Structure formats: C-alpha cells, structure tokens
C-alpha cells in the first residue's frame, strides 16, 4: 500500500489543488507553498540519481522553475506529485545525458583536484554501493518504487513506460541487487525482498 504523500489525499489533496488554482490565476507567492510541500521529496529523488549535493540543489531548483512555467499544462488526470516526478525524471535523464558528454573532462578534473573524503555512514555506503551497481533507469525505478512507494502504474506514467514493463524491470533489478549482495556476503534491506 502506498503511504500518504503529504498534500495529495483527502482534504490535503484539495488543498494542493486549490493552491495550484491560485498559482494559475497569478498568485506567485502561493507557489512557495507547493515548493515547501514537495522540496524534500524532490531533493531525495534527485540526490540519489546525481550523488552530488550542489548538482542536486541546482536540479531541484530547475525542476520547480520548469514546473511553475508549465503549470498551465497540469491536468488533474494524475496527482500533482506524479506530474512533478515525471518532470523530475525527464530532467534527470537530460542531466545524465549531458554528464555523459562531459564525463572525460570531469574525470580529468577530479584527478587533478582531489577532494577531501567524508566518511559516509554504513547505511549510506550500502545505498551508494547498490545505486552505483544499477543503470540510471534502474535507479529511477528503484527510488520511485522502494523509496517513494509509487505503484507500477504511477511509475509507468512518470517514466512513459508500460506498467507491466516497469514491473518486469523492477523484478530484474531486485534479483540483480539480491544476487549482488549475496555474492558480496551482505544482507539486502527488506524493501528489496518482495515487490508489491
């Protein structure tokens, strides 16, 4: 069962829709309430894709700017958060494409300018290790399913892929992670043990 997304169900859902209506009518300050409501979710999602705090902050800001500019296109066929995640997904894919083009230059820069390493917590290390083992598409699916707990239908809508395909991809990546951790002698978090 999908947990309650703040501002998306019952009275709160109507509240978000009312705020969106105010923004569409020109109340720019009302948009700050939308940002406040969804900023943390967007940051978490983007960070696990980009793995860099500064890039994540920039990406989140760009996503909210694009959402504001395209709010007139939002139709209530999906929840606002699903619409926002769809926008975030496409933005992350564009960033990853750009990063791919500049990978060699960045790699050279990092070799010339080593940074001070901060020791991550054991849990952060496991998450980081698992995410680096996955493709960008698999990371998106995993984060939307296991962290944000969207249904396969919602993930399919966000990513523009059939829900049945998302389910198969999720099962494959789940098995991939389980095999990886078994081979490494570790334990995989219970979230990956079963799909819903």
Predicted regions and their residues:
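Short, charged helix-capping/linker segments at alpha-helix termini
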Residues: 3-10, 24-33, 43-62, 163, ...
């Amino acid at each position: 069962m999908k947990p309650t997304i703040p501002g998306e169900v019952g009275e709160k859902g109507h509240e978000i829709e009312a705020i969106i209506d105010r923004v569409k009518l020109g109340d720019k300050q009302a948009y700050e309430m939308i940002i406040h409501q969804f900023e943390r979710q967007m940051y978490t999602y983007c960070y696990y894709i980009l793995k860099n705090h500064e890039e994540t902050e920039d990406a989140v800001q760009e996503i909210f700017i694009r959402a504001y500019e395209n709010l007139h296109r939002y139709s209530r066929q999906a929840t606002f958060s699903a619409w926002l995640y769809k926008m975030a997904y496409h933005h992350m894919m564009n960033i990853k494409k750009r990063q791919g083009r500049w990978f060699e230059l960045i790699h050279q820069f990092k070799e010339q300018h080593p940074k001070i390493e901060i020791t991550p917590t054991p849990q952060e290390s496991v998450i980081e290790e698992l995410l680096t083992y996955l493709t960008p598409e698999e990371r998106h699916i995993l984060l939307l399913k296991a962290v944000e707990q969207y249904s396969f239908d919602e993930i399919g809508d966000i990513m523009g892929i059939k829900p049945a395909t998302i389910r198969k991809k999720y099962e494959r990546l789940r098995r991939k992670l389980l095999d990886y951790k078994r081979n490494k002698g570790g334990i995989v978090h219970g979230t990956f043990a079963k799909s819903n």
